[in-house]
């Protein structure tokens, strides 16, 4: 919790300059570097990574 107050962002992306406070946020961000679309609409062609 204190990292939020002090601006510490120890989790850094290896592919861009993104950094964040916790590992789960980094894991979510890493999906932006892939072409995998996990969530697809059953009724149309819409798909999203998140």
Swiss-Prot record:
GO biological process: regulation of gene expression; segmentation
Gene3D superfamilies named in the record: Classic Zinc Finger (3.30.160.60)
Cystine crosslinks: none
This protein's record includes keyword DNA-binding: yes
Chain positions of all zinc fingers (C2H2-type): 1-5, 11-33, 39-50
Recorded GO MF terms: DNA binding; zinc ion binding
Record keywords, A-Z: Developmental protein, DNA-binding, Gap protein, Metal-binding, Nucleus, Repeat, Zinc, Zinc-finger
Main location: nucleus
CC annotations in GO: nucleus
One Pfam family in the UniProt entry: zf-C2H2_16
Compartmental location: Nucleus
Protein family membership: Belongs to the hunchback C2H2-type zinc-finger protein family.
Function statement: Gap class segmentation protein that controls development of head structures.
Protein name, entry field: Protein hunchback
Organism of this sequence: Lithobius forficatus (Centipede)
